[in-house]
Design a protein with these regions (language model features):
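General helical secondary-structure elements
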Residues: 4-6, 32, 76
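Bacterial N-terminal signal peptides
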Residues: 18-30
Length: 175
């Protein structure tokens, strides 16, 4: 009789240990958020289609504040700037003479500062710079005149719609 009880208690303890382990694993699956390695928590696209250097400066400040917040809080992010029309002024050092986007005095005075801040965001914070190729080709700007960090996209407005609709990006335009 004693041997029978001992066998039953050992089976009971084994089942209880296995059951407890199973229960813990099930709870962890429910409680711990499932984040895939390739999943980005924050996706934001900025629309730059304006010519005002002060407005561009404000946008760069906004982006810098955003990426620093994400980095300080260990939040994976994908931040992009899509440049369309007048925005082309900010991704080249070409004066764009004879085009509707020609450099003016305010841009000349701020270009070095704006370039440095933009390229720092691209190189140090992985902010992606995307330029509408329709804009570039319509003014005859050679690709080698663009900052090397700039990626050409077929259409800026199509890209903005795609990022928002298909990829879940938040849209920001600095006014």
């Amino acid at each position: 009789m004693n041997n029978n009880w001992h066998a039953r208690s050992r089976v009971s303890v084994q089942w209880t240990s296995g059951g407890l382990l199973t229960l813990i694993l099930l709870l962890l699956m429910v409680v711990v958020p499932q984040v895939r390695a390739d999943e980005v928590e924050a996706k934001v696209v900025y629309h730059a289609d304006f010519s005002d250097p002060r407005r561009f400066s404000a946008m760069l400040t906004s982006i810098n504040n955003m990426v620093n917040h994400y980095a300080n809080n260990f939040i994976d992010y994908d931040v992009r700037i899509v440049f369309v029309a007048h925005g082309v002024r900010f991704v080249t050092d070409d004066k764009l003479s004879g085009t509707p986007f020609a450099e003016d005095k305010p841009l000349t005075e701020q270009r070095e500062n704006l370039r440095g801040r933009l390229l720092t965001l691209a190189e140090m914070h992985n902010v992606k710079l995307e330029l509408c190729n329709i804009t570039r080709s319509q003014i005859g700007l050679a690709e080698d005149k663009l900052y090397r960090q700039v990626e050409l996209i077929p259409s800026g407005v199509v890209r903005l719609a795609q990022l928002q609709q298909e990829e879940g990006f938040a849209y920001i335009k600095i006014e």
